[in-house]
Amino acid sequence: MQALLLVGAGGAAGAVARYLLGVQALRWLGPGWPYGTFAANILGGFLMGLLAGGLAHRGGAGQETWRLLLGVGALGGFTTFSAYSLEVALMIERRAYGQAFAYSLGSVALAVAALFAGLLLARRVFA
């Protein structure tokens, strides 16, 4: 139960932070490109790396609490791209270059394809 509360609280905070970033990016830079999403994905990757490195260095008690609150919750709510980035980085560190390339390309291509499939289905169902 405590794990669910940590993930939920972190996820709520991350989602609000992403929303506010998107609002500010739109206000500052305009609607010409998805600046908010781009920034959230890059910042989320950076923060996930910082968290993973910090937790690996620190170790010990409380590590799982911080991982759940910040890694799974806050960064998961801010962007799932941060978790994806960590997974690719771990593959590269293990020298699994082919796997990292396939996962990177496949994740992006299939996510975009799935989005289009969902749009197509929604348009047919709700037309």
Curated annotation (Swiss-Prot):
Fluoride-specific ion channel. Important for reducing fluoride concentration in the cell, thus reducing its toxicity. One of its GO terms (biological process) is cellular detoxification of fluoride. Na(+) binds at residues 76, 79. Keywords: Cell inner membrane, Cell membrane, Ion channel, Ion transport, Membrane, Metal-binding, Sodium, Transmembrane, Transmembrane helix, Transport. It is found in: Cell inner membrane. The keyword Nucleotidyltransferase does not apply. Belongs to the fluoride channel Fluc/FEX (TC 1.A.43) family. GO terms for cellular component: plasma membrane. It catalyses: fluoride(in) = fluoride(out). It holds the Pfam family CRCB. Na(+) is not transported, but it plays an essential structural role and its presence is essential for fluoride channel function. It is a multi-pass membrane protein. This is Fluoride-specific ion channel FluC. InterPro entries: FluC. One of its GO terms (molecular function) is metal ion binding. The keyword Transport applies. HAMAP family: FluC. It comes from the Bacteria. The chain crosses the membrane at residues 3-23, 36-56, 72-92, 101-121.
